[in-house]
């Protein structure tokens, strides 16, 4: 490849920020004593590894302001880090501002979770979000990212979001945590969406076919440097992980999670060298071979 591991630069410039490693810790939890402890641990990991971090849904703290302190601690720990606030798509512009202010966020993730709400007995049944998302994105002072929560993004949705002021799209593909399954298990209605959705890979291909121009984040089953690399090849600017990081944190502790992230950094460097890619722009020129199943998917979706 005529390249050295010392000459690799896989940093990514997105949302007005230079991410030295194209990965961050994705939104998971918050609002309870146990969840706040997890967020503190994640913030320490993010700080030590120079990673961005997203907090879990702040809806509970917007409803009960006394719970906001648990979220605010993330900023106290990761004082100079890039933080994503997180609210649902039904929240007002005022609530969006409150969520951002709560953690002095650098960006806001607005999660869209129709397939999670429908199996819930108490879930929403009306989903008129696009106009509200655009209002928030056009008036908020920080970048706004629309985030799926494990069901992927289709061409139709990419094209709808192209007409809005959002800065980025987090595809949240199937393959990681399945919230439809979780909600079905605790629901009385048994509405089964276990197999619903597009995978992270399929969503990245959908973005290409929709000629997406928004910044792109790959989430959903990211568990290795190889998956980060594949996401970058297919057009993602960043990748992130929620469930995998949380599971490792609970099972092995924060030090082991940091070891995993360090290993990913080393492995990603080697993958760039192996493919003769000095940077992300060059890695997107890597020749691709698709499986028969993926070729079939592409053919049907053209």
Residue ranges and their predicted role:
Residues 93-152, 157:
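Metal-dependent enolase-superfamily TIM-barrel catalytic cores that perform enediolate-based chemistry
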Residues 13-61:
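Active-site cofactor/substrate anionic-group-binding motifs, chiefly glycine-
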Residues 67-85, 127-145, 189-216, 262-271:
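Alpha-helix-loop-beta-strand connector modules within alpha/beta enzyme cores
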Residues 23-26, 51-56, 82-87, 106, ...:
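Hydrophobic faces of well-ordered beta-strands that scaffold small-molecule active sites
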Residues 105-129, 157-207, 250-252:
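Glycine/Thr-rich beta-alpha phosphate-binding loop at enzyme active sites
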Residues 191-215, 219, 223-302:
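Alpha/beta catalytic cores of nucleotide-metabolism and tRNA/nucleoside-modifying enzymes
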Residues 1-15, 19, 293-295, 299-302:
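An N-cap/entry alpha-helix motif that binds or orients negatively charged groups
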């Amino acid at each position: 490849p005529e390249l050295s591991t010392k000459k690799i630069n896989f940093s990514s410039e997105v949302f007005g920020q230079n991410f030295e490693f194209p990965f961050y810790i994705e939104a998971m939890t918050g609002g309870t004593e146990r969840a706040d402890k997890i967020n503190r641990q994640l913030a320490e990991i993010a700080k030590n590894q120079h990673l961005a971090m997203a907090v879990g849904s702040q809806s509970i703290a917007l409803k009960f302001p006394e719970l906001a302190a648990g979220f605010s601690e993330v900023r106290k720990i990761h004082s100079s880090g890039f933080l994503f606030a997180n609210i649902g798509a039904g929240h007002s512009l005022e609530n969006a501002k409150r969520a951002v202010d709560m953690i002095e966020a650098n960006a806001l993730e607005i999660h869209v979770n129709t397939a999670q709400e429908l199996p819930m007995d108490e879930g929403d049944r009306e989903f008129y979000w696009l106009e509200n998302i655009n209002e928030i994105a056009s008036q908020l002072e920080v970048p706004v990212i629309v985030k799926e929560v494990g069901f992927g993004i289709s061409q139709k949705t990419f094209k709808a979001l192209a007409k809005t002021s959002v800065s980025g799209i987090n595809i949240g593909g199937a393959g990681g945590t399945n919230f439809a399954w979780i909600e079905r298990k605790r629901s009385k209605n048994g509405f089964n969406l276990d197999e619903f959705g597009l995978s992270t890979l399929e969503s990245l291909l959908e973005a290409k076919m929709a000629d997406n121009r928004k910044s792109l984040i790959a989430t959903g089953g990211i568990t290795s440097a190889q998956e980060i690399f594949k996401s970058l090849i297919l057009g993602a600017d960043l990748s992130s992980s929620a469930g995998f990081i949380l599971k490792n944190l609970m099972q092995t502790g924060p030090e082991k999670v940091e070891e995993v992230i360090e290993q990913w950094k080393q492995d990603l460097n080697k993958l760039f060298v192996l493919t003769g890619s000095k940077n992300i722009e060059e890695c997107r020129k890597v020749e691709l071979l698709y499986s028969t199943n993926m070729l079939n998917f592409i053919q049907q979706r053209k």
